[in-house]
C-alpha cells in the first residue's frame, strides 16, 4: 500500500482496503484478492472506534479490474468482529464472482450446484 495514502488517510479506510486487495492480486498473480482493515479491539485505536472495519475485494478478468468495498460497524468481542469481517469479505468476493458469470451460466445450474457442502 502506498505510504502516502496511509500517511494521509490512516490504515482504516476504503482506499487502503482496496489497495490491499489489489496488492494481493498483483503479488500473488491471482484473479481475486480480499482484504480487511479495521479495529477489532479491544477498544479504539488511533482514533478509530472498535468494530469499524472496511472489507474489499478485487477481481481481474480479461484485462478488466473490478473492485468493491464495504464499511462495517460491528459489535462484540475482538473474535466476533474478526469473524464477521472475514465472512463479509468472503461474501463481497462471492458477489464479484457472481456478477462476472454470464446470466446463461447461472440459469443452467442444477439443484446439486446449489446444495450446501456437508
Language-model-detected regions and their locations in the chain:
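Short alpha-helical segments enriched in small residues
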Residues: 1-118
Amino acid at each position: 500500500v502506498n505510504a502516502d495514502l496511509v500517511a494521509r488517510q490512516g490504515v482504516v479506510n476504503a482506499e487502503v482496503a482496496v489497495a490491499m486487495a489489489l496488492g494481493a492480486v498483483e503479488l500473488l498473480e491471482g484473479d481475486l484478492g480480499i482484504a480487511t482493515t479495521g479495529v477489532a479491539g479491544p477498544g479504539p485505536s488511533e482514533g478509530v472506534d472498535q468494530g469499524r472495519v472496511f472489507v474489499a475485494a478485487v477481481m481481474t478478468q480479461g484485462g478488466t479490474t473490478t473492485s468493491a468495498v464495504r464499511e462495517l460497524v460491528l459489535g462484540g468481542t475482538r473474535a466476533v468482529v474478526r469473524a464477521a469481517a472475514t465472512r463479509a469479505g468472503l461474501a463481497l468476493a462471492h458477489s464479484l464472482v457472481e456478477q462476472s458469470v454470464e446470466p446463461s451460466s447461472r440459469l443452467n445450474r442444477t439443484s446439486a450446484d446449489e446444495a450446501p457442502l456437508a
